[in-house]
Curated annotation (Swiss-Prot):
This is NADH-quinone oxidoreductase subunit H. It comes from the Bacteria. The lineage of its organism: Bacteria, Pseudomonadati, Pseudomonadota, Alphaproteobacteria, Magnetococcales. It comes from Magnetococcus marinus (strain ATCC BAA-1437 / JCM 17883 / MC-1). HAMAP family: NDH1_NuoH. It holds the Pfam family NADHdh. It is found in: Cell inner membrane. GO terms for cellular component: plasma membrane. The chain crosses the membrane at residues 21-41, 95-115, 124-144, 172-192, 197-217, 257-277, 281-301, 317-337. It catalyses: a quinone + NADH + 5 H(+)(in) = a quinol + NAD(+) + 4 H(+)(out). Keywords: Cell inner membrane, Cell membrane, Membrane, NAD, Quinone, Translocase, Transmembrane, Transmembrane helix, Ubiquinone. NDH-1 is composed of 14 different subunits. Subunits NuoA, H, J, K, L, M, N constitute the membrane sector of the complex. The gene is nuoH. The keyword Cell cycle does not apply.
Length: 343
């Protein structure tokens, strides 16, 4: 594969010149990265509906195509052909900009995700920090949508979502600190390679548990979907959106679900490393997909199983339970590392 890519690059430089080929090659890499992500996001919606249907003893989508396999395409066509309605009192520029900001920040994070030692768009030394920064920017799009809609339900949903994302991002970030301490790097590839022989999910199990619950809350998924609580806020910050402006929020949410699942796999479950050395003949990207799929399954299972939290319970859990525990966990891991070094 490396030789094939090198030959393509050599041909491109020969025909287009180094400057133009660099631009074309960058665009090609971005397209090759984004296309599978959008495909996975689209069919994750079908997987969710089928899985929840199974858990609720019903069929789920089964009319469009064989076993409903074309349902996501039908939904995409429906969103594309619908008219984008702008509320009369909305701030129009910000109203359109908000879903674009949310969707773009959800995709930009993928630039630093390594799918294998060689398969990464941008191998930066601060990959973890970059992903956390991009996830923080997503809160601005949601808050902006609530404000720009200029309606009560949307504003309340935007404020709820921003507060929730900021609250749980703190504990999520703190749970990643022990992983960085053990690996000695912010580079995702180095963190995966440091887990040879022992995945960090085993010695850092409490942190892994808090990480998973925190990312469920940060992505506004059930049972923490307070910003979109239908019984209270109609549809929260998405109330006034339709067509592809609504679709961008929808795609951004599911792209974030896959993103935090991949990040959890890389940080705690060994990424592309096999569980035992005897299975190393299986390509690393297969292991990464399997581990990510397991985490995504738990996202969907939680939605079908648990009732929604009250907002005060949600905030109390984040600030009074997870934040102190994650801080104490950093201290415990640091103390254990110090004592082991002394021994």
């Amino acid at each position: 594969m490396a030789e094939f890519i090198s030959s393509i690059q050599a041909m491109g430089v020969a025909y287009l010149g180094e400057t133009l080929w660099t631009l074309v090659w960058t665009i090609l890499k971005i397209a090759v990265l984004i296309a599978p992500i959008l495909f996975c996001v689209t069919y994750l919606t079908l997987a969710e509906r089928r899985l929840i249907g199974f858990m609720q003893v019903r069929l789920g989508p089964n009319r469009v195509g064989v076993f409903g396999i074309l349902q996501p395409l039908a939904d995409a066509v429906k969103l594309f052909v619908k008219e984008t309605m702008l509320p009369a009192k909305a701030h129009r520029t910000m109203f359109i900009l908000a879903p674009i900001l949310t969707f773009s920040t959800a995709l930009v994070s993928w630039a630093v995700v390594p799918f294998s030692p060689e398969l990464v768009l941008a191998d930066v030394n601060v990959g973890v920090l970059f992903i956390l920064a991009m996830s923080s920017l997503g809160a601005y799009g949601v808050l902006l949508s609530g404000w720009a809609s200029n309606t009560r339900y949307s504003l309340l949903g935007g404020l709820r979502s921003a507060a929730q994302m900021i609250s749980y991002e703190v504990s999520m970030g703190f749970t990643l600190v022990p992983v960085i301490m053990l690996s000695g790097s912010l580079n995702l590839g180095d963190i995966v390679e440091s887990q040879k022989g022992l995945w960090y999910a085993l010695p850092l199990l409490p942190g892994f548990f808090i990480y998973f619950i925190s990312v469920v809350a940060e992505t506004n998924r059930a049972p923490f979907d307070l910003p979109e609580a239908e019984a209270e806020l109609v549809s929260g910050f998405c109330t006034e959106y339709s067509a592809m402006t609504y679709g961008m929020f929808f795609l951004g949410e599911y792209a974030n679900i896959i993103m935090v699942s991949v990040l959890g796999s890389l940080m705690f479950l060994g990424g592309w490393l096999p569980p035992i050395e005897a299975l190393s003949f299986i390509p690393g990207i297969v292991w990464l997909i399997l581990k990510t799929g397991v985490l995504i399954f738990f996202f969907l299972w939680l939605r079908a199983t648990f009732p929604r939290y009250r907002y005060d319970q949600l905030m109390r859990l984040g600030w009074k339970v997870f934040l102190p525990i994650s801080l104490a966990w950093i201290f415990i891991v640091g103390l254990a590392m110090h004592l082991l070094d002394m021994a």
